[in-house]
Amino acid sequence: MSRTIPFLFKLVNRAVILPTAGFTLGVGAFVKAWPDDAGVLSLNDPQTPAELISATKSRQPMELQRVDILAQIEKSEVYNKLAQDEKMHHVLFSEKIPSGHREYHVGQGLLFGKGKLEIDPLVFHDVNHGELTVIYHLGAELGNRDGNVHKGLLSLLLDEALCYCGFPLLPSKRGVTARLSLEFFEDIPVDTTIILKANVKEIKGRKCIIEGHLEQFPLEVSSRNGTRSWNLPHIWGFNHKQEMAKKFAKANCILVEPTWFKYFKWLDMF
């Protein structure tokens, strides 16, 4: 009997007391450290009109970005078509990350800047129809010894974007990745501009299925000024609308909302 009591105390201490105390202290410290502007730009907020007309209006310092790449993108037919689409909510990625936490975010901190993610990703989101387009530029420091972008980074971009695409359609506007399936077709050379396209395929209660892919950014510039850049398929007589963009990878994401998330709707923690 004398040995049983210490054993039970150790069991309760390890299984109940210590985990509860650790969780309580962790949540308390986390919430205290969370910036005051954390809830300013959450997915629960109404869309604000006309945040951006030009990609140069960035929340990230322009000295950390490739201005020449931004200029090329702004002249492209793809960008202008998206920017003029009234269904699309146009923001920069940094606008969705609280300013106090950007430096700790992988894509906005560790992997952002010259030689890395060289522009603040341009986001076009049709929330009602579950469609998302994001434009990135992948710098030279994101490559392996063969000069191709690391697959781990591409996996991160796909996971993050597909979740972002599906979050607004979940009951509590947030969830977790239950499964992410990836398939890579071709390597992406460094110093390449790419487009990520995603769309929600199925939404059922607390479960959401999203598909997406990475493709090459088209080099043709917009014809809004009446001219186009040199493009051999056009010279040879091919219709640019019939050309298929090169796909580098595709992904399928199953997003779920844990039942207990509904109790934290009031807390803009995540």
From Swiss-Prot:
Give the range of the organelle targeting sequence: 1-12
UniProt xrefs under InterPro entries: HotDog_dom_sf, PTE-AB_protein, Thioestr_dom
Leader sequence segment: none
Q: Which UniProt keywords apply?
A: Mitochondrion, Transit peptide
What is the annotated localization of this protein?
A: Mitochondrion
Q: Name one GO cellular component term.
A: mitochondrial inner membrane
Record's Gene3D superfamilies? Hotdog Thioesterase
Q: Name one Pfam family in it.
A: 4HBT
Task: Describe the task this protein carries out.
Answer: Component of MIOREX complexes, large expressome-like assemblies of ribosomes with factors involved in all the steps of post-transcriptional gene expression.
Q: What else is known?
A: Present with 704 molecules/cell in log phase SD medium.
Subunit info here reads: Associates with the mitochondrial ribosome.
Specify the protein name. MIOREX complex component 3
